[in-house]
Amino acid sequence: WSWFWYYATGKAQATVEGWRAREAKAGRIYACGSESFGGFPFRFEMNCAAASASFQSNQQPVEIKARNILVAAQVYQPTLLLSEFHGPLTVATPGQAPDLVVNWKLFQSSVRGTPSAPERVSLVLDKPVLDSVTNGNARTLLRANHIEIHGRLAEGSVLSQPVIEVALRLDGALAPDLHPATAQPVDAKIDTVLRGLNDFAPKPWHERFRQIQAAGGRIDVTQARVQQGETIAVGSGSVSINPSGRLQGQLRVTIAGLEPFLKRIGAQQIVQTSPTVDKLAGALDRLSPGLGNVARQQVGANLTAGINMIGEQTTLEGQRAVTLPLRFDDGRTFLGPIPLGD
């Protein structure tokens, strides 16, 4: 048995080196400051200290570093790779100080399949924090209690017309500077299907988006549930990428607790200062000075009632709710008539 284990470990080392050599030819360089193999008798383990990944083929070269990565597989289940990452993880232009720093309490991944033909990939993070760093000053972009991302090859293969199912789970996630809607903790369960890829070879995301658009691909949101405080939303629909590389499409969304959500995002001010209301207020002011401002106030004060009249009345999880379209129009987002931003 020991002979078999050492033989298999040697084959694993050769496989890793062969994979690194192939990736290096494409400008993707993976390295360890030091590495060791172990796990005898029932596991194969590779420990990579001072791990780094350098992507030289990107339009803007990127270097990613992590303190330590442990990869393991059971002898009796060699096509299931389990990994544990130790931070911090940094993202930087090669030779420069980090632009992004990620820390976490626990970060694990699993990959089922082979390196050339993965079937399922899962990422699980406890207490992740993503910081942007400028001139040594850190600003939190994202933090959460728990994040899970699961991907599965539903159709095709990684080399030909793959259709990818992606499931996202968020617990207590917030992005303070992204948008007023994400400044408070969010719990979410979102299941999607990505169609339109030619293959899943590593490439910059802008190239991948162009590929999806050219193939008439889309993202199907098969089911989604998002909760923030007393606001609950569920929905489904499809979104595509237009020739400008922006999102285009619509989800049908049912929302309970709409009014607190509108207050959080400042919907009243958004509507009162929209170009349409500006034109109306200007015309009314020409008829009677001050009338335009009265109209603005009425529009804002009656916003929730107006949306409830436009939307379809229903119930959601025992609460009064309204169903509205969540539209993506050339990258702009609208909840019913309310612009949410780009």
What are these regions (language model features)?
Residues 25-157, 224, 235:
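N-terminal beta-strand/beta-hairpin edge segment
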Residues 16-28:
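Membrane-interface amphipathic/juxtamembrane segments adjacent to transmembrane helices
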Residues 161-167, 174, 183:
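Gly/Pro-enriched, hydrophobic low-complexity segments
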Residues 52-62, 89-100, 127-142, 172-183, ...:
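Flexible, membrane-facing loop/turn or short amphipathic-helix motifs
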Residues 33, 208-218, 224-226, 231, ...:
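Extended terminal
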Residues 1-17:
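N-terminal type II signal-anchor transmembrane helix
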Residues 119-122, 162-167, 216-223:
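Short, hydrophobic/aromatic-rich segments at coil-to-beta transitions
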Residues 35-37, 66-76, 102-116, 139, ...:
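Extended lipid/amphipathic-ligand handling interfaces
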